[in-house]
Amino acid sequence: AQGAPNLTGSTGTAYAANPFNGEATSFNNLGAQVQWRLSRRITVGGWYGYGFAANRRTSEEARISNWAAFLGLPDFGGKGNLLGFLFGAAPRVLDNDYRPRFTTGRLIGQANPNLRRRLDEDPPFQLEAFYRYRLNDNISITPGVFVLFNPEGNSANSTQVVGVVRTTFSF
């Protein structure tokens, strides 16, 4: 058996990754990104992505988007270090024609108009801060924190805070 589609590589909401509840899906994605070094010590940028998903069995379509803006401060606190901030919205379904199907009765397999469409009501915002500290030419340590607002595109879900530490070895 074939697994469910994962259009967003496991980032963003479950509906964005699988907008048609496991049905065969095609996906076309457009994106743009920019990064501008304002000075030796300040870099700004961002990206925007927009995707068009189509249910391969029906004429149903879904639209998925994501975006972010970032600020980087190279050499902050020392050569090779980096202080960074990011704010954006993880992939989410903006609009979706799909409705769950009837599973019994004379309408089996048809869309049920009484059930909600698979779309994300609230934007899943993410705020991120990190500091890459260069120990030497080959090793850096990057502590950071992520704050997730409206996880899974639902404002009823509690805000999540996640601390991370990454060590990078470059040889």
Model-derived features with residue positions:
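Transmembrane beta-strands of outer-membrane beta-barrel pores
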Residues: A1-Q2, Y48-A54, D75, F87-V93, ...
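Predominantly the C-terminal beta-signal and adjacent terminal strand-loop region
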Residues: R132-V165, S170
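Membrane-embedded translocation segments of transport machinery
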Residues: A1-R37, R41, F52-A54
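Residues that define the transmembrane beta-barrel architecture of outer-membrane proteins
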Residues: S26-L30, E60-W67, P123-L127, N157-G163
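Extracellular loop and loop/strand-boundary signature of outer-membrane beta-barrel proteins
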Residues: Y15-F20, A54-T58, R101-T103, L107-I108, ...
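Repeated loop/turn-to-beta-strand initiation elements of outer-membrane beta-barrel proteins
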Residues: A1-P5, R41-V44, F76-L83, L135-P143
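Residues on the lipid-exposed face of transmembrane beta-strands in outer-membrane beta-barrel proteins
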Residues: A32-W36, A69-L73, A129-Y133, V165-F169
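C-terminal hydrophobic structural anchor segments
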Residues: L73-L135
